Amino acid sequence: LQQNLLKDREKAEQSLREYHAFYLRELVNAATGLVCNCSGKDNSYFRLYNYPWAVTFFLECWKLWGEKENLKTAVRITEKFYEQDGFRFYPIEMPIVMLCQELEKAGEQEDLKTVRDLFRRHADQLIEIGTAYPASEVNYEQSIVQPAAEVILQVYEVTGEEKYLRGAEQQIAVLELFDGQQPDYHLHETAIRHWDGYWFGKRRVFGDTFPHYWSAENGRTFKRYARLTGNEEYNIRGEHSLRGVLSMFFEDGTATCAYLYPYSVNGQKADFADPYANDQDWGLCMNLE
């Protein structure tokens, strides 16, 4: 979508149209909002993480082309997410504010009320859970805490209700614990993550990754908090967090999905950028917001 701002717009838009068609044909049931994990609408491996990304995609298509069906699809996907116990889930990149803003602009008041109520219920549930985080795909990690902070903080932005700001601040206090301020670009405001070189890398090595693209999620939350409260310290910290993942891109145009920071892991040499370029463009997306 960002490529549409460049000079070769026609070629980029054709590619985007083709991907939009692929998404609807292979992954998303636009009528029901179901988002499948694999092509062929194969949902044998159920994954709620896919839903927020699908909402974001169709929202961006709506913003670009002005085709109302994309906005409606984003709403149906949101509703389907919550039908499947999404209220207790910790989603990465749920575009709460953007969806509400776009529905408001489009005059879709009924849909706006529906999704606002869903988002409030979600935030209320996460506040009730507090710091007694349930296990997700792993038992505990930064990308469980950050979604809690981000969902609650976005609901505060949409509603202006003080209880959501207080709830988000409880989560941010925990989120900060994943970051250090060491004088090394690998470690300065870069949230610690552990499994990503194994799950997403070529060499499949467990070990602390500094950085991995999801590290920058902290930066998004810190900057949102700064904007809503006027706390400049968090704006600076957020900027450092976002810049930290830019080290995953190299001057020759190649990139890495994760940097395995320890010198060795279980006796195996580490301290390397994994050869795979795999999803690291999320880091660019977060810097472009």
What positions do the PLM features span?
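Substrate-binding groove/exosite segments of carbohydrate-active enzymes
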Residues: 1-63, 72-75, 79
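C-terminal low-complexity, acidic/polar tails when present
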Residues: 40-49, 54, 60-62, 68-75, ...
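Glycine- and aromatic-rich loop/turn segments at beta-sheet edges
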Residues: 23-43, 70, 76-94, 120-145, ...
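Terminal, non-catalytic domain-edge segments
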Residues: 121, 125, 148-289
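Extended, well-ordered alpha-helical scaffold segments
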Residues: 8-26, 65-84, 107-130, 160-178, ...
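Well-ordered alpha-helical scaffold segments within catalytic/enzyme domains
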Residues: 1-10, 53-67, 83, 93-112, ...
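Hydrophobic alpha-helical segments of membrane proteins, primarily the transmembrane helices
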Residues: 47-50, 144, 211
